[in-house]
């Protein structure tokens, strides 16, 4: 063991919720005096935070464990795949410990057993917002754990349990700390953001001399007081989602909804155990756009679900034409160990699934390209993520990190833009994924009808 601080390597896999779990473990490790190192060779022990949602994620997680075992030999496994300890130990019987998601205590106990901590705490070395794995200018804000739904294709409840919401004041205080630490964008995540607070009966809690309900709209009202971008992810399509559109129209919340519709056939949605009123869904999308013309709607879909007919797949393509969604992700259905959909009849052949997925994505690519083309000539507020060869790579209010498009600011180097800058960009070109443009220079605001334009270095 090192004569100085004990050293821990860390591998984080999976979704943004798992990333937050990793950040919490890393924060506790630093508080207790452990150094976090970037290589297996430098580590005294390695923690692997796994994903187990779909078969490809299981394979990736097992491969990561194997790589850590081969390179280091002392490995602690946690995360969603940890809910299947027998699968891990069958492949790698010499792992030191296995625990499930958000079981921070078990992870720390395993680290202590393998690598005793120093006795003096290092709290002063850890910022009050904790250790973050994202760039400094944005952060994921997890508001709850688990899910009360039982979608037939999903095993998340068996891994992460039923919904457990964090009290609203606790979430708002964490958001405050993040903003004090330089965060310009808060990405609200959970398994079901729109169910936030139902398990707490929407209990009221005080924050900044005001009472707030533990409810999605009230949380958004509180977050809007912090003066940074706030983006909602994983919103289940409940009717009360309509309540936050007004906040978007007022500029208090980013006009962006990540809302997984999954399919457009009422019969398939019923088999998925998802809401099935497609006509109402289309009406609501149109109503959101009427209330907030700038709104961006992102969604995800599954093609080739068991029993999906040619006609039902065509109805899904028709839905894309009618809904005109801005951003869409999709994947071909694959059985997930433990999911009830595995037992459904009429499984779709693999070649049909992949042919449908290709057609689906081609259809949406056409829609996305036209929607992005319509932004040429407009001015978009953007947040700079990276500087590459005198070009600033940024995201507009319509783009979440990792999953959406980018804005390539051609004169970013000329203007001396930096990562984390907020800047107004005049859009000059587009393709099916990204926008291209020039930042408007700082100095006196440039007036255009309906708005003031100005470079903001914040």
From Swiss-Prot:
Entry-linked SMART domains: Elp3 (SM00729)
Coiled coil: none
Cofactor(s) the record lists: [4Fe-4S] cluster
Subcellular location, record wording: Cytoplasm
Amino-acid positions noted as binding [4Fe-4S] cluster 1 in the UniProt annotation, renumbered to this chain: 15, 51, 80
Pfam families (UniProt xref): Radical_SAM (PF04055), TRAM_2 (PF18693), UPF0004 (PF00919)
Cofactor binding annotation: Binds 2 [4Fe-4S] clusters. One cluster is coordinated with 3 cysteines and an exchangeable S-adenosyl-L-methionine.
Top-rank taxon: Bacteria
NCBIfam families xref list: 30S ribosomal protein S12 methylthiotransferase RimO, MiaB/RimO family radical SAM methylthiotransferase
UniProt similarity note: Belongs to the methylthiotransferase family. RimO subfamily.
Protein name from the UniProt record: Ribosomal protein uS12 methylthiotransferase RimO
Species name: Xanthomonas euvesicatoria pv. vesicatoria (strain 85-10)
Gene that specifies this protein: rimO
